Amino acid sequence: MSEKQKIRIRLKAFDHRLIDRWASEIVETAKRTGAQVRGPIPLPTKIERYTILVSPHADKDARDQYETRTHKRVLDIVDPNDKTVDALMKLELAAGVDVQIKLT
């Protein structure tokens, strides 16, 4: 691969333990093949809150509140080689982790 290329990997998950485990797995895989890795860099957590009326009618005082937290991490693999790309393609991630890969 060209010297100026880098791979940017964005991870998203609802569980921070799961995303941290897979971020470290990607870092180990990339370092094993001789690539330089920057990250994982934690991005701001997106918190969505929902308020639902518990009462079937009229009682506005009875409400439940729920929230979902979306955790995000960014990894940059600088100067990847062919072995790095092959190793990352063979890596199987958990079902709860969303992965976006961009080659720049």
From Swiss-Prot:
Function: Involved in the binding of tRNA to the ribosomes.
Record NCBIfam families: PRK00596.1, rpsJ_bact
Keyword DNA damage: no
UniProt xrefs under InterPro entries: Ribosomal_uS10 (IPR001848), Ribosomal_uS10_CS (IPR018268), Ribosomal_uS10_dom (IPR027486), Ribosomal_uS10_dom_sf (IPR036838)
Listed transmembrane segments: none
Record Pfam families: Ribosomal_S10 (PF00338)
SMART domains per the UniProt record, alphabetical: Ribosomal_S10 (SM01403)
Assembly, per entry: Part of the 30S ribosomal subunit.
Similarity section: Belongs to the universal ribosomal protein uS10 family.
GO process terms (BP): translation
Coiled-coil regions listed in the entry: none
UniProt keyword terms in alphabetical order: Ribonucleoprotein, Ribosomal protein
Gene3D superfamilies recorded: Ribosomal protein S10 domain
GO cellular component: ribonucleoprotein complex; ribosome
Annotated protein name in UniProt: Small ribosomal subunit protein uS10
GO molecular function, one term: structural constituent of ribosome
PANTHER family given in the database record: 30S RIBOSOMAL PROTEIN S10 FAMILY MEMBER
Organism: Xanthomonas oryzae pv. oryzae (strain KACC10331 / KXO85)
